[in-house]
């Protein structure tokens, strides 16, 4: 019979920051067992704006000797499907193991959604289902995997918090850089305008003088013609 575990956590950060951080939280020194994450496909629905992404995750199997003798391989492969709905502010990640499926099944579903009580917070729900069919050690294997799930979930929350702060800091720095650039351009434009205006003020008397001299010349020529 499968074992289940559900964990809920509130991140006191905007959904946009949390969902962005979810894509960027690995690699992390807190989880050296996660060896690689490769994006297999990515597409955005032009009508709904929903992003769908698939990944291959390879983890180092830090398993006890009794479990290693059953599984054999030292690496675990996982397939993950991610769906991000920016309009409804919900992100869903579904993960399942690709190897050892005849011995052990691990399915995980994570959701990030705007908190129902505070739109500036994010509600995170993490659910795991572990199933084993090995006679005699099935329950022991399932319990071990769930314990590992709970331990890794705690590490994952810390990694998320750190990554969210990093995302927010980068956004602030980008905004500050934009403001600095905009201010610099505005200042240069004002200086150019002032210079052009100052030049115009210097040239205007000369133009007026040239016009006056030209008019005088024309009047003189006109008088001379009349005398003739």
UniProtKB/Swiss-Prot annotation:
InterPro entries: PRELI/MSF1_dom (IPR006797), Slowmo/Ups (IPR037365). Signal peptide: none annotated. Residues 1-172 form the PRELI/MSF1 domain. GO terms for molecular function: phosphatidic acid transfer activity. One of its GO terms (biological process) is phospholipid transport. It comes from the Eukaryota. One of its GO terms (cellular component) is mitochondrial intermembrane space. It holds the Pfam family PRELI. Belongs to the slowmo family. This is Protein slowmo homolog. It comes from Dictyostelium discoideum (Social amoeba). The gene is slmo.
């Amino acid at each position: 019979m499968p074992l289940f575990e559900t964990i809920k956590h509130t991140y006191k950060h905007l959904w946009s920051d949390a969902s962005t951080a979810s894509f960027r939280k690995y690699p992390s020194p807190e989880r050296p067992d996660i060896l690689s994450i490769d994006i297999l496909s990515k597409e955005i629905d032009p009508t709904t704006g929903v992003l769908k992404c698939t990944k291959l995750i390879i983890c180092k199997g830090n398993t006890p000797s009794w479990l290693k003798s059953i599984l054999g391989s030292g690496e675990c492969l996982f397939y993950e499907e991610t769906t991000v709905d920016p309009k409804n502010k919900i992100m869903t990640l579904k993960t399942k193991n690709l190897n050892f499926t005849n011995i052990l099944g691990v399915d995980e579903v994570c959701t990030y959604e705007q908190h129902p009580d505070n739109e500036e917070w994010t509600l995170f729900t993490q659910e795991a289902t572990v199933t084993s069919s090995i006679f005699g050690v099935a329950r022991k294997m399932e319990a071990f995997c769930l314990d590992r799930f709970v331990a890794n979930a705690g590490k994952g929350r810390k990694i998320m918090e750190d990554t969210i702060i990093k995302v927010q800091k980068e956004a602030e720095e980008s905004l500050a850089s934009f403001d600095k650039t905009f201010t610099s351009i505005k200042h240069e434009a004002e200086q150019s305008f002032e210079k052009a205006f100052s030049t115009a003020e210097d040239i205007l008397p000369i133009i007026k003088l040239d016009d006056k001299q030209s008019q005088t010349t024309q009047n003189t020529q006109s008088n001379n013609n009349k005398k003739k």
